[in-house]
UniProtKB/Swiss-Prot annotation:
Its main location: nucleus. It holds the Pfam family Myb_DNA-binding. This is Transcription factor MYB117. Expressed in organ boundaries. Residues 58-99 are annotated as: Disordered. Probable transcription factor that involved in boundary specification, meristem initiation and maintenance, and organ patterning. Functions in both lateral organ separation and axillary meristem formation, in part through genetic interaction with the NAC domain genes CUC2 and CUC3 and the homeobox gene STM. May be recruited by a variety of developmental programs for the development of floral organs and the initiation of ovule outgrowth. Residues 63-73, 82-94 have a biased composition (Low complexity).
Length: 359
């Protein structure tokens, strides 16, 4: 009879199970020793086809032949919600509650502490279902103890807290002994609050925001910001615009006709609004360039290094009769005469600042 390789392999598995040996069945020695054996019955082949082999079949047969076997015994092991199996209900551990304490639990804990005292925590935990002795102890000393001081920390307490932390470090239980009525948790939390406050105060962003909130920028100045005894000065402020000085490094000083200085808290440059209205009425443009503390207007460049034209108040409706503003002259240089002003009205030289040429 021809013996196939599959029959030899199945016969080897049956032999190894019968001898309770766990040697690898495909060793060449074992195969040659049992090559003459083969499956004699179809029952052996069915056993080999089952995933558990003949063990599962024999267990099923023994259970069916046992009259005392019942389905209730098969459920002897029970599985809890946590996935753990217990052989009997008597060996199940008590399920401990986790999470926030409920008001009913706090009331029950206060009653038990009043009966057993704040030291028998294991006994109290047996009476309070779902909580351990440690959980009851921490809840009492950190939240429910009537001796807890819940008032805000004073400056003196904060100073002592910082000194104690420099001495003891993060030993909060030891530090809490220096503060009667304060728990170690409250001491630790308030230390972190103080450190966060100090960090915010020393940060540059905090100082910058505080400075801006205390001194907000104002778009227009009032007479109170520029005290000056000259009466013409206030009239000039009411009819002119103010522009912030874009180049504070020039340090231009402002003077009136009578050399009365103008004081400014914000270091601003006063410019008459009608100074540049010549562009609107096709008048000769005035090119003004600034080099250091010098200003060049028209042809008046280099003759007097600190000269500046006296710009009058020009009415757009009457360009032929300009009325000079005697209250104020341009600032930072000496006053110039009428001849300089006439030169300023002439066609000035073109200054090619961008290098684009005349085209």
């Amino acid at each position: 009879m021809f013996i196939t390789e599959k029959q030899v392999w199945m016969d080897e598995i049956v032999a190894r199970r019968a001898s309770s040996s766990w040697d690898f069945p495909f060793n060449d020695i074992n195969i040659h020793q049992h090559h003459h054996r083969h499956c004699n019955t179809s029952h052996e082949f069915e056993i080999l086809k089952s995933p558990l082999g003949d063990v599962a079949v024999h267990e099923e047969e023994s259970n069916n032949n046992n009259p005392n076997f019942s389905n209730s015994e098969s459920g002897k092991k029970e599985t809890t919600d946590s996935g753990q199996s217990w052989s009997s209900s008597s060996s199940k551990p008590s399920v401990l509650g986790r999470g926030h304490w409920r008001p009913a639990e706090d009331v029950k804990l206060k009653e038990l502490v009043s009966i057993y005292g704040p030291q028998n925590w294991n006994l109290i935990a047996e009476k309070l279902q779902g909580r351990s002795g440690k959980s009851c102890r921490l809840r009492w000393f950190n939240q429910l103890d009537p001796r807890i001081n819940r008032r805000a920390f004073t400056e003196e307490e904060e100073e002592r807290l910082m000194q104690a932390h420099r001495l003891y470090g993060n030993k909060w239980a030891m530090i809490a002994r220096l503060f009667p009525g304060r728990t170690d948790n409250s001491v630790k939390n308030h230390w972190h609050v103080v450190m966060a406050r100090k960090y915010r105060e020393h940060s540059s962003a905090y100082r910058r925001r505080k400075l801006m909130s205390n001194n907000p920028l104002k778009p227009h100045l009032t007479n109170n910001h520029h005290p000056n005894p000259n009466p013409n000065y206030h009239s000039f402020i009411s009819t002119n615009h103010y522009f912030a000085q874009p180049f504070p490094e020039f340090n231009l000083t402002h003077h009136l006709v009578n050399n009365a200085p103008i004081t400014s808290d914000h270091n601003q440059l006063v410019l008459p609004f009608h100074c540049f209205q010549g562009y609107e009425n096709n008048e000769p443009p005035m090119v003004v360039s600034m080099f250091g503390n010098q200003m060049m207007v028209g042809d008046n460049v280099g003759a007097t290094s600190d000269a500046l034209c006296n710009i009058p108040h020009i009415d757009p409706s009457n360009q032929e009769k300009p009325e000079p503003n005697d209250a104020m002259h341009w600032i930072g240089m000496d006053a110039v005469d009428e001849e300089v002003f006439e030169k300023a009205k002439q066609q000035p030289h073109f200054f090619d600042f961008l290098g684009l040429g005349t085209a």
